[in-house]
Amino acid sequence: MLSVFRIITLTLLASALAAPALAADSTRLLRFPDIHGEQVTFVYAGDIYTADTSGGVARRLTSHEGLELFPKFSPDGSQIAFSAEYNGTRQVYVMPSAGGKPTQLTWYNDVGVMPPRGGYDYRVLDWTPDGEHIMVRANRLPWGVRVGRYFLVPADGGSEAPMEIPEGGGGMFSPDGSKVVYTPIDREFRTWKRYRGGRAQDVWIYDLEQSTSQQLTDNPATDNQPVWVGEDIYFASDRDYTLNLYRYAEGEEPTAVTGHEEFDVLWPSAGPDAVVYE
């Protein structure tokens, strides 16, 4: 059974879609969570932390004055990949999930500071299921024609390589690594609410073996940040005017998993058998 976790301030909501609050309520703005087994990682005040899904004291892994974002557990949970501003530019790093010295993996100059609605360069999205590469979204074009593209970065170091998909926002590998679920349009950092225009996102699958794509959702609303858990795909959608988590199973219409009415589901991320979100 799928477990769904939500980080709201320092509150974790756990189990199969509903559970009691499990932590204190004094900390705010926990962001960009990821989950692996009984551990979650997240960003607070620009640093990376981990905590148990059952609650308790969070463990601080970084303390550099540079901003760290988008932590993602490796498939075996032993490492965390993330992006950070340590040397004047944003780059991708990896470190042990128990804490330790970060290792820099990318060396390509980033595009510099973008406007808030442009988000961040070098967004860490996922690992390949074999743990050998890290999937990132990065910009490589001038401002006037800037688009984000997916790249694979070797986890042990080496040159990054572009993926076949020409442009995209959030994305994640299928459990067997043969496909990617993604949105061709990136709009995660826009502040548009209940948008129904030409930049509304839909969820697609790209088959890496066949080099073909398939559209899964076709809705005037926003469908974004898709993740893959087992045979099912989960994504955030505001088709009911608040971003909630939806489940897509092959051959079925998407169904709502959460029913929030006041606050949106943001930045859902998945482990082998669970989804966590802001």
What are these regions (language model features)?
Residues M1-V4:
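N-terminal secretory signal peptides that target proteins for export/translocation
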Residues A19-A23:
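Sec/Tat signal peptide C-region and signal peptidase I cleavage site
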Residues A24-T53:
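Beta-strand-rich domains and repeat architectures in extracellular enzymes and scaffolds
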Residues V43-Y49, S63-E68, S83-S97, K101-Y122, ...:
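A flexible loop/linker signature enriched in serine peptidases of the S9 family
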Residues D34, K72, D126, M172, ...:
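Conserved beta-strand position repeated across blades of beta-propeller domains
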